[in-house]
Regions:
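Conserved anion-binding
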Residues: 22, 26-30, 105-178
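Glycine/small-residue-rich loop that forms an oxyanion/phosphate-binding "nest" at active or ligand-binding sites
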Residues: 68-123
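Glycine-rich phosphate-binding active-site loops on the catalytic face of alpha/beta enzymes
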Residues: 102-119, 204-208, 221-239
Length: 247
């Protein structure tokens, strides 16, 4: 997903669980709310509101490693013109290929970027500028496996190791703010951006339109987009208004 002009991309989030569109709080599967039984219907609602991009996560894939929810992604690609950024359970090259083949624009790799360097580097090499990294941060540590584990790996060391790869973006999520609507953790974003030249996407904590206004005013050259989830579903943010702000 390439930067379009100077405006930020708004990525409404669709989290997939058991074939439905849900939201979690802080990644806790026990705190799951179903917002739409049909991910395709939800995607069409977003498309009708003017967005061009979707951020989709397969929660079942992230936790169990299965790939059932790919059917929903195929339906969205066939029936809308939305560009899709997709992650969750992407742990081998066959899955990356399958996602690219069904039209996913940007494949997100999380856990495997930290645990299987060979696979990750091969994915980036095979699909330059189509792979993003999910950098999920939980109390200054890297969280993996559906945020159930933290890695004994310094964020700075990891960022150095990927600096020369042709990566699309780093998706920076504050796990503790995800679904909490507590506002964006700007300090965390800045701590990551100062250590890398790679484009970044902000995620976690967006609560209302003022968060987007502040993010836009900060004019970070590296922030290419922002992921918004619960605040849209709970109607704290109107997408049409949000799109005007980021442009």
């Amino acid at each position: 997903l390439s930067r379009v002009g100077t405006f930020m991309i708004i990525f409404p989030a669709i989290d997939l669980k058991d074939g439905k569109c849900v939201r979690l709080i802080q990644g806790d599967f026990k705190q799951s709310t179903t917002y739409n039984e049909s991910p395709l219907e939800q995607a069409k609602i977003f498309e009708d509101s003017g967005v061009e991009y979707l951020h989709c996560v397969d929660l079942d894939g992230a936790l169990k490693g299965n790939f059932e929810n790919i059917k929903s992604i195929e339906q969205i690609k066939k029936n809308t013109n939305l560009k899709i950024q997709f992650g969750g359970g992407v742990r081998n090259i066959e899955r990356v290929e399958r996602l690219i083949n069904i039209g996913v624009n940007n494949v997100i790799i999380g856990t495997s970027a930290f645990e299987n360097k060979t696979f990750f580097e091969k994915s980036v090499c095979n699909y330059p500028n189509r792979i993003s990294i999910a950098l999920d941060i939980k109390q200054n540590q890297i969280a993996t496996k559906g945020w159930k584990e933290v890695k004994d790996l310094q964020i700075s060391d990891f960022l150095k190791s990927i600096e020369d790869l042709n990566i699309n973006s780093i998706i920076i999520t504050d796990v503790m703010r995800d679904g909490m609507k507590q506002g964006i953790n700007f300090e965390m974003l800045e701590n990551v951006m100062v250590q890398t030249k790679i484009d970044c996407v902000a995620s976690g904590g967006v609560s209302n339109i003022s968060d987007l206004i502040i993010l836009k005013k900060k004019n970070y050259s590296q922030i290419k987009g922002v992921i918004v989830g619960k605040a849209i579903y709970d109607k704290n943010i109107d997408i049409a208004e949000a799109l005007k702000i980021v442009r």
